[in-house]
């Protein structure tokens, strides 16, 4: 009980400090954030077996954005290092992201081993349309380089499409619903099947208020019809 109380007070203190810092740095093009999640689920796929920490730093200027992010399960079952750049204009965003998984590629792999035949990197290109008059988004993405290969070593260009809608009750309460599908015989279906719905997600986001400070939180229910799996996760967010 004392440990739970200590953890709560620590989170409250951290949130207070980060919000205070945020007010001072609101005009900076740089940002930093930390997400704590009970489980890492992305596009209907489970990564790791334990709560996961996601530190991230970013830079944004006149539509250009760059980021570096990590993902670390507390039991060591998953590690991830991501880099990305994107450009947004009006309702459209295009970008490229690099995903690297030290826990999955083995000791023989190296971060700077960039030969496409045996690299551990997964490089993805994507485009997103986000409506300004209606709260709808559409994303198309495809792995274009790296470890996205079948057993024969063939580059599979695994592609994914997602359509989502956000309904806002007020500034601090909204629910987002989305459906995502694998478009070809690729990674999302273990290279075994073509078009399939792999991600149905309902996410509720709100913020706990402590005086003038807010702690953003979210809860998500995720269903992967192809794998016949469902998940429920919760996350806390801290940012400067």
Question: What are these model-derived regions, one by one?
Answer:
Residues 1-29:
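Cleavable N-terminal export/targeting peptides
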Residues 20-73:
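Short glycine/proline- and aromatic-enriched beta-strand/turn motifs that initiate or cap beta-hairpins
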Residues 21-29, 95, 130-135, 168-176, ...:
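Short loop/turn motifs that connect adjacent beta-strands in outer-membrane beta-barrel proteins
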Residues 28, 49-53, 60, 77-81, ...:
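Residues that define the transmembrane beta-barrel architecture of outer-membrane proteins
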Residues 34-40, 63-74, 94-102, 109-111, ...:
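Transmembrane beta-strand segments that form the barrel wall of outer-membrane beta-barrel proteins
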Residues 44-48, 78-82, 105-113, 148-155, ...:
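Outer-membrane beta-barrel translocator domains and adjoining extracellular loop/strand segments
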Residues 113-186:
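Detector for outer-membrane/organellar transmembrane beta-barrel domains
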Residues 202-208, 228-240:
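Outer-membrane beta-barrel "beta-signal"
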């Amino acid at each position: 009980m004392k440990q739970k109380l200590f953890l709560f007070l620590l989170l409250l203190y951290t949130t207070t400090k980060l919000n205070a810092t945020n007010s001072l740095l609101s005009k900076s093009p740089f940002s930093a954030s930390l997400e704590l999640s009970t489980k890492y689920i992305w596009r209907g796929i489970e990564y790791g077996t334990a709560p996961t920490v996601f530190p991230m730093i970013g830079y944004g200027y006149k539509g250009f954005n760059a980021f570096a992010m990590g993902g670390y399960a507390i039991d060591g079952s998953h590690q991830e290092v991501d880099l990305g750049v994107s450009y947004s204009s009006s309702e459209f965003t295009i970008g490229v992201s690099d995903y690297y998984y030290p826990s999955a590629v083995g000791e023989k792999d190296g971060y700077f081993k960039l030969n496409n035949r045996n690299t551990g990197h997964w490089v993805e290109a994507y485009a997103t349309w986000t409506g300004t008059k209606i709260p709808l988004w559409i994303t198309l993405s495809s792995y274009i380089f790296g470890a996205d290969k079948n057993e024969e070593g063939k580059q599979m260009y695994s592609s994914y499409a997602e359509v989502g809608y956000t309904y806002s009750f007020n500034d601090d309460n909204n629910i987002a619903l989305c459906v995502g599908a694998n478009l070809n015989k690729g990674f999302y279906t273990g290279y075994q099947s073509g078009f399939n719905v792999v991600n149905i997600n309902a996410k509720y986001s709100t913020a706990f208020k402590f005086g003038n400070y807010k702690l953003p939180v979210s809860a998500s229910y995720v269903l992967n019809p192809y794998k016949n799996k469902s998940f429920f996760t919760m996350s806390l967010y801290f940012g400067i």
